[in-house]
Amino acid sequence: MNLALSLAISPYDHARGLRPAGIDLNVHELAIEEMFFRFTRFREWDASEMSFGKTVSLMSQPSPDIVPIPVFPSRVFRHSAVYVARNSGIRTPKDLEGRKVGIPEWAQTAGIYARGLLQHEYGVELARIQWHQAGVHQPGRIEKVELTLPQGVSIKAMPQRSLAEMLAKGDLDAVISARDPGGTRLFEDYVPVELEYFKKTRIYPIMHVIVLRRPVYERDRWIAMNLLKGFEEAKRHSMQRLVEIGLSHIPMPWLAEHARRWREVAGEDFWPYGIEPNRPTLEAFVQYAHEQGVTPRRLKVEDLFAPETRERFKI
């Protein structure tokens, strides 16, 4: 008899047909913000897609009640997440210093990566920026995890306003956000910039991770590896569809050629799960999260994930 398990996840092609051995999934497809809010606040499902930033924050606390597995359903390069007001005069990353910059949440994964690359690739001093926190399009968004901000960094909460409104009215000079708040991108032609960044660093930013509620994991620890294997199999079929030239599996022209070119750069498995294929990205993220006060200490990558998923048997 299979184990019944509830899972909240976005409707990804690479999770299509997900059938982990020994598990009957009850899948809930929700908008990302609702999913993260409900799982962070109420732990409504046995397993959930989760913000990587919030995950490392929770894992840095004593006795965390979640257990991540190294499945990364969403990855996005984040040079494209930096937006500037049209009349701000900001032309380079260093121009952000001394300016008012909005964020939806300091612990938003996209922002952690963007601030990390601004700091480490372009020499931007985060403490020299005036940070303002608000919802992207709606007032009232709040931080959902505990922060230990680095020296010199302060954040002004703006609960009655939105980032989009403040950017449009000139009350903010820039916004770092996973969603478009308006304005223009600092890196206007961002694709070649992000491609060179990947070639240089091998960092392919991980946005989301799959986590289990700890009581669910502790009761049946085998589900961690079975879920990982199930996700890997679903992803393998998705990647085959992406490079298929005989059919249009996704309504986008030249998709197979785009996938072929990306595979030439990133390797045969161009969307890897597991720890070792993602080590440059994972090490960079735990460093950024600690430097920016999302975690009070730098986490060890291996300590983030269920032990059963850290190694494989060999014949």
Tell me what each language-model feature is.
Residues 63-65, 185-190, 311-314:
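Short low-complexity, flexible loop/linker segments enriched in glycine and/or proline
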Residues 142-243:
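Pocket-lining segment of extracytoplasmic ligand-binding domains
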Residues 211, 217-291:
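Secondary-structure end/capping motifs
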